[in-house]
């Protein structure tokens, strides 16, 4: 059975823990690679959650005829 993706908060917490472990610098190469791979998965999960939240906010603003959001910084 497929594992349920973690919530944004769960993914971010796990990602922070992975970074902390890797920054200690005492992991074997193979374990570091596994943690790095997991970190990439968690980063993608967090990015997807943030994109979904941004879209929901945009839809709500449009539905309520509120001014649309402008990018905080130049986005490509």
Curated annotation (Swiss-Prot):
EC category name: hydrolase
Keyword Cytoplasm: yes
Disulfide feature: none
One CC-aspect GO term: exodeoxyribonuclease VII complex
Primary localisation category: cytoplasm
SUPFAM superfamilies: XseB-like (SSF116842)
EC number, UniProt record: 3.1.11.6
GO biological process: DNA catabolic process
Keywords of the record: Cytoplasm, Exonuclease, Hydrolase, Nuclease
A GO term for molecular function: exodeoxyribonuclease VII activity
Assembly and binders: Heterooligomer composed of large and small subunits.
Membership in a protein family: Belongs to the XseB family.
Protein name in the entry: Exodeoxyribonuclease 7 small subunit
Organism (species): Methylococcus capsulatus (strain ATCC 33009 / NCIMB 11132 / Bath)
